Structures are given as C-alpha cells and as structure tokens.
UniProtKB/Swiss-Prot annotation:
Protein name, entry field: Cytochrome b
UniProt function note: Component of the ubiquinol-cytochrome c reductase complex (complex III or cytochrome b-c1 complex) that is part of the mitochondrial respiratory chain. The b-c1 complex mediates electron transfer from ubiquinol to cytochrome c. Contributes to the generation of a proton gradient across the mitochondrial membrane that is then used for ATP synthesis.
One term of GO molecular function: ubiquinol-cytochrome-c reductase activity
Annotated positions binding heme b b566: H97, H196
Other known facts: Heme 1 (or BL or b562) is low-potential and absorbs at about 562 nm, and heme 2 (or BH or b566) is high-potential and absorbs at about 566 nm.
Subcellular location: Mitochondrion inner membrane
Binding site for heme b b562: H83, H182
Co-factor remark: Binds 2 heme b groups non-covalently.
Superkingdom: Eukaryota
Length: 379
C-alpha cells in the first residue's frame, strides 16, 4: 500500500516540497539561506503578533506602548529585541541568498528570480514601515524623509506624498496606515515565498558547477533537512546572542527619544540594511535623479539575466568575473559604510565613486568579462 504521505492531498504537497524533492547532490551551504529565510519569516510573524497585542498605533501612545512592552509585559523585552534583531538576521540571509544567486547564476531561472526581486522589495517596504512604529525621533524623521522622495515624481508627486501621509505631514493617520501595512505585508511575503518555491520546484535547484544535475539527484530528506538544521542552529545562535548580549548594537540611540516634529536629528539615517541604497540616493545632487538611482539599484537585479553573456551559468570556473563579483561585494560594503556617515568631504566623493562603480560593474564590466572569457575559451 502507498504511504498516505505520498497520496493524501495535503501531505502530498509537503512531501513533494520537503521530503521526496529531487535535489542536486553537490549543493553547498550557500543553498541553506532559502530555508533560513523561511525560518526568519516565521520568527518575525510570531514575535510581531505578540508585539501587536500590546502595541497601540497612535502618535500619543505608540512610544509609551513600546516602553510598556519592554518593561511590563512578560518577556516583552525579549520579544521586542528578537523582532528588531530578527529583521537584521532576515536581511543578512536575504543579501547572502541574492549573492549566491548572482555568483552561481541562479538568475537564469527567470520566474523564480523575478518573484525573488519582488520579495526583496516587499521585505524592504515591510522593514521600513516597521521602523516607523516605535515613534522615536529616527522613526518620525526617517518616515518624513523617505516618503518625501515621492514628491520628486513629476506632476503627481506632492499629491501622492499627501495621500500617503493622510494629511500635510507625517502624523496619526500615517502611523495607523503604516501599522496596518506592516501587519499585512508579512503574510503577502509568505504567499510570494510559496510562489517562489513553486517556480523553483518547476525547474529544480541549480548547483555550484552550473551544469545540469538531472541524471544525479538525491532526496531532500534526510540529507538536506539535516544540513538545514545545522544552518538553523547557527541562525538561532546568532540571533539569540545578539538579542541577549547586545540588543541595541544595530539600533539608533535617537530612536529612544520621543518623536518631535520641531527638532531634527543631526544625522537622519535608516537601519544598516538600507544604508547602501541610501548612500546611492544621497550621492546624486538632483532629487529625481537620486530617487531613480535608488529604485534602479534594486530593480537592476531584474536586468541581470539579460546581461549574462557567458556560455557558463556559474562563476565557479570564471576567474575574471569572480574578481569583479568580489569587487562588487566590497563596493556594497563601502556604500553601506558611507550611508551611515555625515554628508561632508570626503564621504560625498567616496559615495559618488562607489555608486558609479556599482552600476558600472553590473552593466558594463560583468558582460565584458563574460565576452572575454568566452573568447579565451574559443566559444
């Protein structure tokens, strides 16, 4: 008799996705981040749900409700810091997951890659709105600065900003709608992640070599379930170490001051995971130009499959492109550093150079190096 695991309509879906899924035998730990992102999402939804039970989305009580959570609610401090640092872990896993996709040519699975890019944008929107909720100084001014960027859109810009704000400034209406969207978006992310998996399982995973692994597959369970559990242990270790020993390492001290529309903080900056995009935005003196560069710095991911001129999928055997890839990583780290610095010499110049380098490597140098490698291999 066939096992109900393989025949029951519900368990059959789980079986085909996580148990009997044919998987390449040679995928490395870089393939762990997909499952870790799933775990991060579960952690964020769970902790967020408990926070929402005690939080009040109102300008007069939001800040004190967060203080109440950390002081008076049982383990409220832990839930809050797990949620805040969980977002950081989420983005660490996201960036590594995207980096792996770029390095090993996973972007050639177009549907999976494009849904992934939409997932990145949705996650960024969710994190931004979550940062506004504690209603500290950086929450308020971050919301004001970033939503104000919409005013750069010709004709409809200023109307659009007022429509988003629900008034003439960031106020009660803005906070309420941001809370609403921050609550609903993680469930949309979960739905998109399911579609992401659906498209992935249509083609199957790629592998480090970039060659087809169709003739040689192993089942996902027990091999990769055990491997994913190891990744999960490292993730939880990192998250709990951060939460219990250095909970405020990645937060801004200004956010412990109640939002005050009459007092601007000396340096308005977002959380660390947005700093690279913020640096690109600031490096262009023109407002509309900056907004376009900001949007393109993320949407460029969708163009990468078209810029792939190499006859090989993976970068594993392409030393010239490997050098460019790691230069791009260094460039992104530089942008992240610059995003947190004040707008003055020499940071402005470094930011502009790093921003130009970012687009130059992706649009010009990588396709060029692929063509050179093809020529050297006489392909």
């Amino acid at each position: 008799m066939t096992s109900p695991r393989k025949t029951h309509p519900l368990t059959k879906i789980i079986n085909e996705s996580f148990i009997d899924l044919p998987t390449p035998p040679n995928i490395s730990s870089w393939w762990n981040f997909g499952s870790l992102l799933g775990i991060c999402l579960i952690i964020q939804i769970t902790t967020g749900l408990f926070l929402a039970m005690h939080y009040t989305p109102d300008t007069s009580t939001a800040f004190s409700s967060v203080a109440h959570i950390t002081r008076d609610v049982n383990y409220g401090w832990m839930i809050r810091y797990m949620h805040a640092n969980g977002a950081s872990m989420f983005f660490v896993c996201l960036f590594l997951h995207i980096g792996r996709g770029l390095y090993y040519g996973s972007f050639l699975s177009l549907k999976t890659w494009n849904i992934g890019t939409i997932l990145l944008l949705t996650t960024m929107a969710t994190a931004f709105m979550g940062y506004v909720l504690p209603w500290g100084q950086m929450s308020f001014w971050g919301a004001t600065v970033i939503t104000n960027l919409m005013s750069a859109i010709p004709y409809i810009g200023s109307d659009l900003v007022q429509w988003i704000w629900g008034g003439f400034s960031v106020d009660k209406a803005t906070l309420t709608r941001f809370f609403t969207f921050h609550f609903i978006l993680p469930f949309i992310i979960a739905a998109l992640a399911t579609i992401h998996l659906l498209f992935l399982h249509e083609t199957g995973s790629s592998n480090p070599s970039g060659m087809t692994s169709d003739p040689d597959k192993i089942t996902f369970h027990p091999y990769y379930t055990a491997k994913d559990i190891l990744g999960l242990i490292f993730l939880l270790l990192s998250l709990m170490s951060l939460t219990l020993f250095m909970p405020d390492l990645l937060t801004d001290p200004d956010n412990y001051t109640l939002a005050n529309p009459l007092n601007t903080p000396p340096h308005i900056k977002p959380e660390w995971y947005f700093l690279f995009a913020y640096a690109i935005l600031r490096s262009i003196p023109n407002k509309l130009g900056g907004v376009l560069a900001l949007v393109l710095s993320i949407l460029i991911l969708m163009v990468i499959p078209m810029l792939h001129l190499s006859k090989q999928q993976s970068m594993m055997f392409r030393p010239i492109t490997q050098i460019l890839f790691w230069t791009l990583v260094a460039d992104l780290l530089t942008l992240t550093w610059i995003g947190g610095q004040p707008v003055e010499y020499p940071f402005v110049t470094i930011g502009q150079t790093a921003s130009i380098t970012y687009f130059f490597i992706i649009i010009i140098l990588m396709p060029l190096s692929a063509s050179i490698e093809n020529m050297l291999l006489k392909w």
